[in-house]
């Protein structure tokens, strides 16, 4: 029988509900419990798939092809459970489903209202997403008091009553600011945040007090007194130098013991030795490299959250401090390749649209010609093919149809718009995949023996997650291969190019998939680990 921990946030946004929730989940998992996590987003978009990276940050793709909130990436990095489309839903998705049922007549002519129809659908999805887990942590996006969050808060209020206090609890994250001039932390914002919760029928069972200073015992006692929360359940969570310390911080204050006792669960003690090893490797590196990351969303690094974390994981695996030099690809267009000088390797991640693409192509050329280790991901592979066609084959008009529909050499094109030898457009079956023209979710990939990518994975067949509309044009592929482009990975049916490499280069790998979505701090990822090793070799050679 599943127990539920509902997680809310107060005072301000960006307190780290996802990290705190995932850290608690990691401790409970370390005690032998089956744990899952859900993220409920109050915005009206159906999913984040079409949202601007500058506003929303990264779109995290699940194994089954759902485009979800970046917090699901945190969940998968902290616990072993694989997230699915059932682990994330939005207001837009809820209303879409309810309205579809209304149009079908499923409500038998009833007046459709927020209560009970919207709240019932929210509760149904929470229960479905929890599945057969021992404990499900359910994070409500936004901040208590936001008008968008009200149906979700009402739904969890109802669900707490329905399942009973032995199966549901509320964990509230709140800001406890430190006033430097007074030399003390202030508890009043937390008191008011809890008051707001209680006004809608929600009494927190646990308070996570976020601060840049430790919240001392006297402050915690005061908070407990004014909020009706047990003193042992008022947890201090100050800023740390690595988020992978947080499971240990929460465990040291007995949060998991409180949860287990409250739910009456019989389980083992927590073994956090894996996390201790991660923290030790992170904070005590033996080597150091600098990697230039050339992207187009550098104003909001959350747009590359999983990728940045994956590079950190590769550093942990190699006992190496990885310094990422963030470079806007438009700056390369304006200032040239001097921005890349001194980097031990170059990383070009994915993206959509024309802006900044020429800067990425220039970065690829610099890496190829100067024998600097290169890793391209998604668009990073496509620009590698374009650069090869332009500068090795001499096809100066080579491009992707995403950027130039009239290119004389469209080496990259929409999955549905291949032209055959006569110029007629060929429609591919992939058009019916989830997401229409978007290829989403886990796909098998066959690796060529003896290739760099095969050396990294040590396997003939791998499974990685995709999120793209464009692919290498198979009609021009034979000429590209004849000129020296190495195709080292193909889709399971052999029809699509998944990985390319460069001959006579120490380490040049570009993949169409997104390996960052499956990297974790405890296991790392073979491709990123190999990339950092190549960067180390480059640095030592210099």
Swiss-Prot record:
ATP binds at residues 14-19, 71. The active site is at 378 (nucleophile), 514, 516. Mg(2+) binds at residues 71, 139. CTP binds at residues 13, 146-148, 186-191, 222. Homotetramer. Keywords: ATP-binding, Glutamine amidotransferase, Ligase, Magnesium, Metal-binding, Nucleotide-binding, Pyrimidine biosynthesis. Catalyzes the ATP-dependent amination of UTP to CTP with either L-glutamine or ammonia as the source of nitrogen. Regulates intracellular CTP levels through interactions with the four ribonucleotide triphosphates. GO terms for molecular function: ATP binding; CTP synthase activity; glutaminase activity; identical protein binding; metal ion binding. It comes from Pseudomonas putida (strain ATCC 700007 / DSM 6899 / JCM 31910 / BCRC 17059 / LMG 24140 / F1). Coiled coil: none annotated. This is CTP synthase. Belongs to the CTP synthase family.
């Amino acid at each position: 029988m599943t127990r539920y921990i509902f997680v809310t946030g107060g005072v301000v946004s960006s307190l780290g509900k996802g990290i705190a929730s995932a850290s608690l989940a990691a401790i409970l998992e370390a005690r032998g419990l089956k744990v899952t996590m859900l993220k409920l987003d109050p915005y009206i978009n159906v999913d984040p798939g079409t949202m601007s990276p500058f506003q929303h940050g990264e779109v995290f793709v699940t194994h089954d092809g759902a485009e979800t909130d970046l917090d699901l990436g945190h969940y998968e990095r902290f616990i072993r459970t694989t997230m699915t489309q059932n682990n994330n839903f939005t207001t837009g998705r809820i209303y879409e489903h309810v309205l579809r049922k209304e149009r079908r007549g499923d409500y038998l002519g009833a007046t459709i209202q927020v209560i009970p129809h919207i709240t019932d659908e929210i509760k149904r999805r929470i229960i479905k997403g929890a599945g057969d887990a021992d404990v499900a942590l359910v994070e409500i996006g936004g901040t208590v008091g936001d008008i968008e969050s009200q149906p979700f808060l009402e739904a969890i209020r109802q669900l707490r009553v329905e399942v009973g206090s032995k199966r549901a609890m509320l964990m509230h994250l709140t800001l406890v600011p430190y006033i430097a001039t007074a030399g003390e932390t202030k508890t009043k914002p937390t008191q008011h945040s809890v008051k707001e919760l209680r006004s809608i029928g929600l009494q927190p069972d646990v308070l996570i007090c976020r601060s840049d200073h430790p919240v001392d015992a006297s402050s915690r006692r005061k908070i407990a007194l004014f909020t009706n929360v047990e003193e042992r359940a008022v947890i201090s969570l100050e800023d740390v130098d690595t988020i992978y310390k947080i499971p240990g911080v929460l465990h040291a204050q007995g949060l998991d013991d409180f949860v287990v006792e409250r739910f009456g669960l019989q389980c083992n003690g927590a073994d956090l030795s894996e996390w201790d090893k991660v923290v030790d490797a992170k904070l005590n590196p033996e080597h150091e490299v600098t990697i230039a990351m050339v992207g187009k969303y550098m104003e909001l690094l959350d747009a590359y959250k999983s990728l940045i974390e994956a590079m950190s994981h590769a550093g942990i695996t190699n006992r190496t401090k990885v310094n990422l030099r963030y470079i806007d690809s438009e700056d390369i267009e304006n200032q040239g390749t001097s921005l890349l000088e001194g980097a031990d390797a170059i990383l070009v991640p994915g993206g959509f649209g024309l802006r900044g693409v020429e800067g990425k192509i220039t970065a690829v050329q610099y890496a190829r010609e100067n024998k600097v280790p290169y890793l391209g991901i998604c668009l990073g592979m496509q620009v590698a093919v374009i650069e090869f066609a332009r500068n090795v084959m001499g096809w100066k008009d080579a491009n992707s149809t995403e950027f130039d529909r009239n290119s004389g050499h469209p080496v990259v094109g929409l999955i549905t718009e291949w032209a055959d030898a006569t110029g007629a457009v060929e429609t591919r079956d992939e058009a019916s995949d989830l997401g229409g023209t978007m290829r989403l979710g886990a796909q098998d990939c066959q690796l060529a023996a003896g290739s760099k990518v095969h050396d990294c994975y040590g396997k003939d067949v791998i499974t990685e997650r995709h999120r793209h509309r464009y692919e290498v044009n198979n009609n021009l592929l034979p000429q590209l291969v004849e000129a020296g482009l190495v195709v080292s990975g193909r889709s399971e049916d052999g029809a699509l190019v998944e990985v390319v490499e460069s001959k006579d280069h120490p380490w040049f790998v570009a993949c169409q998939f997104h390996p960052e979505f499956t990297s974790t701090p405890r296991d790392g990822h073979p491709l990123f680990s190999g990339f950092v090793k190549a960067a180390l070799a480059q640095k030592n050679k210099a």
